[in-house]
Amino acid sequence: MPMDVILVLWFCVCTARTVLGFGMDPDLQMDIITELDLVNTTLGVTQVAGLHNASKAFLFQDVQREIHSAPHVSEKLIQLFRNKSEFTFLATVQQKPSTSGVILSIRELEHSYFELESSGPREEIRYHYIHGGKPRTEALPYRMADGQWHKVALSVSASHLLLHVDCNRIYERVIDPPETNLPPGSNLWLGQRNQKHGFFKGIIQDGKIIFMPNGFITQCPNLNRTCPTCSDFLSLVQGIMDLQELLAKMTAKLNYAETRLGQLENCHCEKTCQVSGLLYRDQDSWVDGDNCRNCTCKSGAVECRRMSCPPLNCSPDSLPVHISGQCCKVCRPKCIYGGKVLAEGQRILTKTCRECRGGVLVKITEACPPLNCSEKDHILPENQCCRVCRGHNFCAEAPKCGENSECKNWNTKATCECKNGYISVQGNSAYCEDIDECAAKMHYCHANTVCVNLPGLYRCDCIPGYIRVDDFSCTEHDDCGSGQHNCDKNAICTNTVQGHSCTCQPGYVGNGTVCKAFCEEGCRYGGTCVAPNKCVCPSGFTGSHCEKDIDECAEGFVECHNHSRCVNLPGWYHCECRSGFHDDGTYSLSGESCIDIDECALRTHTCWNDSACINLAGGFDCLCPSGPSCSGDCPHEGGLKHNGQVWILREDRCSVCSCKDGKIFCRRTACDCQNPNVDLFCCPECDTRVTSQCLDQSGQKLYRSGDNWTHSCQQCRCLEGEADCWPLACPSLSCEYTAIFEGECCPRCVSDPCLADNIAYDIRKTCLDSSGISRLSGAVWTMAGSPCTTCQCKNGRVCCSVDLVCLENN
């Protein structure tokens, strides 16, 4: 397709989406206040006057409440979010000054998939989301908890984040793309995080979620629109990558087909048969006289059929009978006596014993043996002249059955029955021939075997180069014995017809190709289950399940440079520069990169008039010669503070500063909990009210006002019954690739891009997958022949991982 046509189509798509974005399809938005039916909610919310009268506004009171979506609303929300990469949350809010609270939260159990929070104490807006199964937080410094009305709109387009406040673009960031496929059970909360945390105090109006590009236009129609959006661009890139993959696969299949055709054109293999040491070519026929069969070699297999005997047209004075050594019956004269017809060899008892021979009854002079039974038990067998006792063993007399048949006794006679694997040749089963199960296809030999007929049975022989699996199956190689298998070292290898199968040993899980040790209680914080119920913990954690963080600072494992101090982090630590020092940009782990700040050279000192600034390690001093100008006063915010003067900072009522000899010293307000007028905002530790306590995120522990704790990579503080949490401060890094290991909160430098969590993809650095297909950097695919293995190209490196849940289900 010509490039100009593509550009025209792209312009049409963008224009159409822009128009739709301005009009906002009602099917692609959710009015949260309407869906939650706040008009009929009485506990914790009250309808009040809003910024305008076009919609209802509600006051969220400082009481326990549960404002969340009904199941049908949650399901609607899940469907709207599914596979969406463009969405905007907007609302008009008036937040109580200096408070913290969650405006909107979409969560499932403890996982926040979308959460917008405003913190008054830290003066920032926070966006919480999930990426790659891990929580992420974007902290956007802005004071919204000031008691004034604000319009807020947070827009996400793939990895592009926009924050508008009062129709002004406040922040624009690149983030990790959030997970939008919400799991079943997800719930929407308004004005709180869950039942017990994050209560918003103030008024909310016009709460909506828009699932289209440029959703902020609904709130601020005069703002500029973006086309294409980040999501549009990424969709286009993904489409190109998909087409590239499809073309590569089709090329690979075509090359394989051409190779196979070339092999077939050059291949001619005649299949022969070998019987009793003789070699027969394909379609050769021969007579197996011993077994009365006609045999033919067909494609390497012997097919035999019993000879078809011609129909006998015996004369009226003869009967067809079997003659020893012949396959077909012949006509022999019959005998008639007293109306009874006798065939050749049959006997009849008259006054004497006679046998039919050549159409004549010949007298037999054999004497009958004496009987040792009563006369009532005497019986006359068929075609015999001598009586016998009932229960007589007819089979013990002269053999009548051939070697391949067995004699069976009956009341008055004995009959012959063919043994297993044989069939009658002469009709009465006295003469039996072997059944050729191979030729008759009555065998159970599987692939890679040759059926070999044996007297009364058959055998499945492996073709050359194959080994036996069982009585009926063979495999090409002894994969298990030779080590030519792909079973995990913790799997059991079994040879099969197709090659081999792998089964994980007890205590391990997987598909046999990959077997992972199974620990019933799991290994926390990135621990590895190395053997059944045995964890190996990563550095920084300990315990049988790696559940305990090691405080490297408190345990004395770390010795930071004297220009820095040790700060413990979950699973790690870092040396933070002390006051008066800053990092030189190399960010050494031990703090050696902390160097003195020269306040004199930078003119950040407070020395006044004729006093001279003298730089000191970690600070400065003011040296003034004697004279009237050496007052020791301090310049501050464009004014002057006198030597010895004490004051409270205008922007921080909890900090007290003093001027001494030209230098300003600031500290937190000293707290006297015995003073009934103590400021509880600055001295929360003096607040003993039960209502000022905070429940931690697990709902298991209470904290007093002023207490601090760490939870899920966030630093939390309880202030007058309100818990405010913000992301832990992490040290800066100067490396190309970083990774946050499981259980840790801060990134570390890694040299392998496969380990990197945050990576800038260079589309010039492509990868070749196992099938020879070229992949762009950032592309993700499933490994051929391994549906549970996912691979990604990271700047020229192929990085693959195995999904254990998938292995267990396949």
Curated annotation (Swiss-Prot):
Q: Which residues form the VWFC domain?
A: 271-332, 632-687, 692-750
Please name every pair of cysteines joined by a disulfide bond in this record.
C395-C407, C401-C416, C418-C432, C438-C451, C445-C460, C462-C474, C480-C493, C487-C502, C504-C515, C519-C529, C523-C535, C537-C546, C553-C566, C560-C575, C577-C594, C600-C613, C607-C622, C624-C630
EGF-like domain mapped to chain residues: 434-475, 476-516, 517-547, 549-587, 596-631
* Residues binding Ca(2+): D434, I435, E437, N453, L454, L457
Q: In the record, which residues are listed under signal peptide? A: 1-21
PANTHER family, alphabetically? NEL HOMOLOG, PROTEIN KINASE C-BINDING PROTEIN NELL1
Q: One GO biological process from the UniProt record?
A: cell differentiation
Q: Which residues are glycosylated?
A: N40, N53, N83, N224, N294, N372, N511, N562, N609, N708
Q: Where in the cell is it found?
A: Cytoplasm; Nucleus envelope; Secreted
Recite the lineage of the species.
Eukaryota, Metazoa, Chordata, Craniata, Vertebrata
- State what this protein does: Plays a role in the control of cell growth and differentiation. Promotes osteoblast cell differentiation and terminal mineralization.
GO cellular component annotations, sorted alphabetically?
Answer: cytoplasm; extracellular region; nuclear envelope; perinuclear region of cytoplasm
What name goes with this protein?
A: Protein kinase C-binding protein NELL1
Tell me which residues make up the Laminin G-like domain: 57-227
Alphabetic keyword roster: Calcium, Cytoplasm, Differentiation, Disulfide bond, EGF-like domain, Glycoprotein, Metal-binding, Nucleus, Repeat, Secreted, Signal
What CDD domains does this protein map onto? EGF_CA (cd00054), LamG (cd00110)
Q: Which domain of life is it from?
A: Eukaryota
What is the additional note? It has been demonstrated that ROBO3 binds to both NELL1 and NELL2. However, NELL1 is not expressed in the spinal cord at the time of commissural axon growth to the midline and has no significant effect on commissural axon repulsion in vitro, suggesting that NELL1 is not a functional ligand for ROBO3 in commissural axons. It remains possible, however, that NELL1 functions as a ligand for ROBO3 at another spatiotemporal location.
Against InterPro entries, the record matches this protein to:
ConA-like_dom_sf, EGF-like_Ca-bd_dom, EGF-like_dom, EGF-type_Asp/Asn_hydroxyl_site, EGF_Ca-bd_CS, EGF_dom, Growth_fac_rcpt_cys_sf, Laminin_G
Q: What is the scientific name of the source organism? A: Mus musculus
Where does it mainly reside? cytoplasm
This entry's Gene Ontology molecular function terms read: calcium ion binding
Under the subunit heading, UniProt states: Homotrimer. Binds to PKC beta-1. Interacts with ATRAID; the interaction promotes osteoblast cell differentiation and mineralization. Interacts with ROBO3.
